[in-house]
């Protein structure tokens, strides 16, 4: 059975103008939030990079040993980025607003990125919890109601709403926001 990487090989030649945004594109951008962009300052602080530019920087850092893929959740994300960057469909999309806050004492794990599609739609992707102790602790705390990451997500949505005037779309892991 095929996966999203196969989809990028198969249909990555089609732009969003040729074939509208679909459920597989939604999944690809949801997985995009799992990229470790901590060392790439240009996707933070109000700046954006095209997926193509992001891949060039990311692959340079990967070669220098600055990118470490330690989690099973992150294992295929460098491949995903490479395939997105080489596709007509995603290469010109712009990523920005990257946030990755892991606070052990608060049991808070908050990560998000916004991808601007060619039509100006801002796709907001929130990373879910992972297989770390902080991730597990936050998962357990979810059974008690609102966790600190929920508040951070609302703040992020508000700042994105102000930064991007066009349509908004997105994916929330756990559907909590």
For each predicted feature, which ranges?
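Conserved alpha/beta-hydrolase "nucleophile elbow" surrounding the catalytic nucleophile
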Residues: 173-177
